[in-house]
Amino acid sequence: VALKERNESITIGLVDPCGASMEAYFNKGTAEASAGTSIIEGIGVNHVTDNVAQARVDQAYTIDDTEALPYAFDLLRHEGLCLGGTSGINIAGAVRLAEHLGPGHTIVTILCDYGNRYQSKLFNPVFLENKGLPIPEWLAI
């Protein structure tokens, strides 16, 4: 709400993992869970909280794990940033928003979780393989 109060032309985006409902709430008006599931923890509520009800979201996207995880893996390999799946989802959403808006826009997102919390899933090649998720070559068995 505060961003829009300061600049009405700001575009606010929201990302949700598969199986969550906020994307549907902002795009369809009902908080119905999307198809699928996600291994990414700590994101994707299935009820509308007061702060969400007041949000002025312009673009909402559902991001699946196969789209999000490569961003988290690339940031670790190329930038030395060990981030979690929520950060990967946020980056994937920022990329989608950038594609939607086109050139000449500034996109800001939040990288909000450390990857070391998810070692048993995010950095476990056996787990990723069992879930049919991408495994970076540097993590392969």
Where on the chain are the PLM-derived regions?
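Short glycine/serine/threonine-rich phosphate/pyrophosphate-binding segments
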Residues: 1, 22, 86-94
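Surface-exposed amphipathic alpha-helices with a cationic face
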Residues: 1-7, 98
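Active-site/ligand-binding loops adjacent to catalytic centers
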Residues: 5-85, 122-141
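Phosphate-binding loop/pocket of nucleotide- and phosphate-handling active sites
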Residues: 37, 92-141
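A short, small-residue-rich loop immediately preceding and capping a beta-strand
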Residues: 81-87, 108-111
